UniProtKB/Swiss-Prot annotation:
Protein name: Casein kinase II subunit alpha
One cellular-component annotation, GO: nucleus
Family named by the database record: Belongs to the protein kinase superfamily. Ser/Thr protein kinase family. CK2 subfamily.
Catalytic reaction(s) noted: L-seryl-[protein] + ATP = O-phospho-L-seryl-[protein] + ADP + H(+); L-threonyl-[protein] + ATP = O-phospho-L-threonyl-[protein] + ADP + H(+)
Organism encoding this protein: Zea mays
């Protein structure tokens, strides 16, 4: 059995009410308090709008959920309620539903986001350090509260660059961590799926989020989005193996006694490890430093137990400047 290196017993030690989302009784607010202004996005499970609270004229985000199991909606609500007020976690303000269709909507705080495809290419070396550090605060917080996000990717990280404000959003795939529990491997978005998901290791943990963060970070520093560009789940593992090498993959599979299905094994083939510096070029060299490479190398590990935890990541030399700036601000 594989078990998280940190925060493994959070839900064991908390009362059942904390993690038993199926028992949640939803307190519905008043739908007429909110009006849709414009559509800002759509996902597999929802449509997202900029809205307005007509009582105080404040902007908000309205996430109208597509028909999905009641249990899944309750899970998302319970997790958002448990995490509310945590650093850089999007705030759930209200839950409403349509009187006739019974379609539920989640009302969130408004964040003025710049699309990452536009924003990321403009970010400086320091900006990347700053925003990854802000994202780590959100991840360490949710992990410390016994919750894995399971869908970390640029689309789910809202950045208001003018205010230098970051929010981790879309908790629809998030789940409570219970040691030894076997989870669905059909989570996360393909380019950000950890090796554990791609080889069907089900007793994964918070460290899945650290792989996804590593993919996101690699994309940012090497200006290569997405960093691992697989065409399907099998090809995704192939793309990872072509960078990390197949020797490490085999060590990982043997350690956890995992057998790849023969078709996937044939596809993966044999590859040597590609040094990180091979991804450096004239366009990205100003973002690639020895500390950045060292940090990346400690995230993108096949073995989920070897990856840095979010808290360990925050102490990495890569963030030294960010920590120093934060300390001088708190002292000021």
């Amino acid at each position: 059995m594989s078990k998280a290196r940190v925060y493994a017993d959070v839900n064991v030690l908390r009362p059942k009410e904390y993690w038993d989302y199926e028992a949640l009784t939803v307190q519905w607010g008043e739908q007429d308090d909110y009006e849709v202004v414009r559509k800002v996005g759509r996902g597999k499970y929802s449509e997202v709008f900029e809205g307005i609270n007509v009582n105080n004229n404040e902007k908000c985000i309205i996430k109208i959920l597509k028909p999905v199991k009641k249990k899944k909606i309750k899970r998302e609500i319970k997790i958002l309620q448990n995490l509310c007020g945590g650093p850089n976690i999007v705030k759930l303000l209200d839950i409403v539903r349509d009187q006739h269709s019974k379609t539920p909507s989640l009302i969130f705080e408004y964040v003025n986001n710049t699309d990452f495809k536009v924003l990321y290419p403009t970010l400086t070396d320091y900006d990347i350090r700053y925003y990854i550090y802000e994202l780590l605060k959100a991840l360490d917080y949710c992990h410390s509260q016994g919750i894995m996000h399971r869908d970390v990717k640029p689309h789910n990280v809202m950045i208001d660059h003018e205010l230098r404000k970051l929010r981790l959003i879309d908790w629809g795939l998030a789940e409570f961590y219970h040691p030894g529990k076997e989870y669905n491997v059909r989570v996360a978005s393909r380019y950000f799926k950890g090796p554990e998901l791609l080889v069907d290791l089900q007793d994964y943990d918070y460290s899945l989020d650290m792989w996804s963060l590593g993919c996101m970070f690699a994309g940012m520093i090497f200006r290569k989005e997405p960093f691992f560009y697989g065409h399907d789940n099998h090809d995704q593992l192939v793309k990872i193996a072509k960078v990390l090498g197949t020797d490490g993959l085999n060590v990982y599979l043997n350690k956890y006694r995992i057998e790849l299905d023969p078709q996937l094994e044939a596809l993966v083939g044999r590859h040597s490890r590609k040094p990180w510096l091979k991804f450096m070029n004239a366009d990205n060299q100003h973002l690639v430093s020895p500390e950045a490479i060292d940090f990346l190398d400690k995230l993108l590990r096949y073995d989920h137990q070897e990856r840095l935890t979010a808290l360990e990541a925050m102490t990495h030399p890569y963030f030294q400047q960010v920590r120093a700036a934060e300390n001088s601000r708190t002292r000021a």
